[in-house]
Amino acid sequence: MILKNKLTKKTLDIPYSEFRKKFAKEIQDAFESYRKTQLNKYSWNFKDDNSLEFNFYFELHWNFNHFGMSNWYIDRM
């Protein structure tokens, strides 16, 4: 994975497992924001609640960048 810092433009090239460890708090914050957004949608009542986490990680690139409040963003996976 290649991550970039929005402020300093620093680049990190790390494997997914290291990303999960190093950015655990940012991932959790992004997931909570994603979860709140999805649960507030009217159509969510028709979906399976167990799929929330699966859907978040399935589109991790987009969700981390748009729901996370981190100075880092995923440039490439």
Regions picked out by a protein language model, each given a short descriptive name:
Residues 1-6:
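A short beta-strand micro-motif
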Residues 16-77:
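Acidic, low-complexity, intrinsically disordered interaction modules
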